[in-house]
Amino acid sequence: MAIYELDGQAPDLPANGNYFIADTAVVIGKVRLLNSASVWFGAVLRGDNEWIEIGEGSNVQDNSTCHTDRGFPLVIGKNCTVGHNVILHGCTLEDGALVGMGSIVMNGARIGRGSIVGAGAVITEGKEYPEHSLIIGSPAKVIRTLTPEQVTAMGSAAKFYALNGPRFKNGLKKIG
């Protein structure tokens, strides 16, 4: 794994070692991972302007990019899932949110608790979405409110990655 200090600021990782950062992920500067957070292959978390926080049990999947601008920290709440090839830039994901593959979430945007951003959606700067929303399109719009059953079911993705992190941390062996 590539973990870098920048200008005297090193990433803040759980002292108990309860996290996973894949060996091809890059974590730079003002990045804080909480317990059971995971950062997967090819993901880049570049905390050179403001803090990036990855909440407890949350995951940033393969080839996703997390970055900030001055005045726009990036906060990923508890038990969130950030799908493959997502760009998060200076935004907030409230607890239990799921961002689908290939989506873009821009500065100042806020995704409500337990919401789903559909694959390929573009969340424009400063947009805020209520909890339990299904958000799709480019530009993204709320198309409906999720049922309680759907909100409960989507938590399984975060749980899967929270369990998969230790599996990879302890069982992955490079053979070539």
Model-flagged regions — what are they?
Residues L13-T68:
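A positional/architectural concept
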Residues M1-N16, D48, E56, D62-S64, ...:
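Glycine-rich hexapeptide-repeat left-handed beta-helix
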